[in-house]
Amino acid sequence: MGKGDWRQGRVEMPCAHVSRLHKTCVQVRVRVTMASSEEDGTNGASEASDEKEAAGKRRRLGLLATAWLTFYNIAMTAGWLVLAIAMVRFYMEKGTHRGLYKSIQKTLKFFQTFALLEVVHCLIGIVPTSVLVTGVQVSSRIFMVWLITHSIKPIQNEESVVLFLVSWTVTEITRYSFYTFSLLDHLPHFIKWARYNLFIILYPVGVAGELLTIYAALPYVKKSGMFSVRLPNKYNVSFDYYYFLLITMASYIPLFPQLYFHMLRQRRKVLHGEVIAEKDD
């Protein structure tokens, strides 16, 4: 073998070796890439499976929430219907409003207190409504039932009590039936109409009844000192229920117009939407 051949041989041998090494590296890279692709595919499939499972869970929770809300609203509609029938029957039999509250108070207390669940519904997010607004509305009703009418028995026969009872009853039957049919995706037009029109009269009548009832309670509260805390005491605090009721009555002045005009805006929004839909058709 000549010197040139030897040199040529030395050159050819590394090239062959490099070629084999290159092939080996390519194979390794291919295997790594395939392994990586398989891993990515596995991860992707796992993520897709997790998303699907999460979506299924949300769907099940949504169905469960809808089922519970449907049951709740049906129960509340039935409860207030029972109250309405009891009030009509009492008046037809007795011919007077005296004794009416006493005859229905247990049913009223149960269903009005049961409405506290509406605050829970807002807290856990199954109803997209403000917790604060719902809490104020529910607590004001419970306040009227337990801390005014129930606690001050001499005012139970006041005509103002009948005013807010009738207003509440018609309003709640309409409201809960509206929610029920909406959840069932079958809302009759007359229920929708009642929901957005009856409040125009019922809301002011109900507020008037509440204010007049609180006003009628003031002399009894002042005379008895009920729910009041006087000084001196070990906690060094005082509370006068009489003045608390005066402040409560005064709070209706700014709050009532805000809520009432908000409801009027909602009514215009809904009715305006219906007009546009009819024109488009």
Swiss-Prot record:
UniProtKB keywords: Developmental protein, Endoplasmic reticulum, Fatty acid biosynthesis, Fatty acid metabolism, Glycoprotein, Lipid biosynthesis, Lipid metabolism, Lyase, Membrane, Transmembrane, Transmembrane helix
Please list the GO terms describing molecular function.
enzyme binding; very-long-chain (3R)-3-hydroxyacyl-CoA dehydratase activity
State the InterPro entries in the record.
Answer: Tyr_Pase-like_PTPLA (IPR007482)
For this protein, the Enzyme Commission number is 4.2.1.134
Signal peptide annotation: none
Q: Which GO terms describe its cellular component?
A: endoplasmic reticulum; endoplasmic reticulum membrane
Q: Which reaction does it catalyse?
A: a very-long-chain (3R)-3-hydroxyacyl-CoA = a very-long-chain (2E)-enoyl-CoA + H2O; (3R)-hydroxyhexadecanoyl-CoA = (2E)-hexadecenoyl-CoA + H2O; (3R)-hydroxyoctadecanoyl-CoA = (2E)-octadecenoyl-CoA + H2O; (3R)-hydroxyeicosanoyl-CoA = (2E)-eicosenoyl-CoA + H2O
Q: Which pathway does the record list?
A: Lipid metabolism; fatty acid biosynthesis
Per UniProt, subcellular location reads as: Endoplasmic reticulum membrane
Q: What class of enzyme is it?
A: lyase
Instruction: List all topological domains (Lumenal).
Output: 89-107, 153-158, 215-244
- Write out the PTM section of this UniProt entry: N-glycosylated.
- Pfam short name (any one): PTPLA
Active site (catalytic residues): 203, 210
Q: What is its main location?
A: endoplasmic reticulum
**Coiled-coil boundaries:** none
What topology does it adopt in the membrane? Multi-pass membrane protein
Output the GO biological process annotations, alphabetical, semicolon-separated.
fatty acid elongation; myotube differentiation; regulation of G1/S transition of mitotic cell cycle; regulation of G2/M transition of mitotic cell cycle; sphingolipid biosynthetic process; very long-chain fatty acid biosynthetic process
User: In which tissues is this gene expressed?
Assistant: Expressed at high levels in heart, skeletal muscle and testis, weak expression in kidney and liver.
TM ranges are: 69-88, 108-124, 135-152, 159-173, 197-214, 245-262
Task: Point out the glycosylated residues in this chain.
Answer: 236
Topological region Cytoplasmic: 1-68, 125-134, 174-196, 263-281
Q: Which PANTHER family match?
A: VERY-LONG-CHAIN (3R)-3-HYDROXYACYL-COA DEHYDRATASE, VERY-LONG-CHAIN (3R)-3-HYDROXYACYL-COA DEHYDRATASE 1
The UniProt entry's sequence similarity note says: Belongs to the very long-chain fatty acids dehydratase HACD family.
Subunit structure, per the record?
Answer: May interact with enzymes of the ELO family (including ELOVL1); with those enzymes that mediate condensation, the first of the four steps of the reaction cycle responsible for fatty acids elongation, may be part of a larger fatty acids elongase complex. Interacts with TECR.
What is the official name of this protein in its record?
Very-long-chain (3R)-3-hydroxyacyl-CoA dehydratase 1
Which organism is this entry from? Answer: Mus musculus
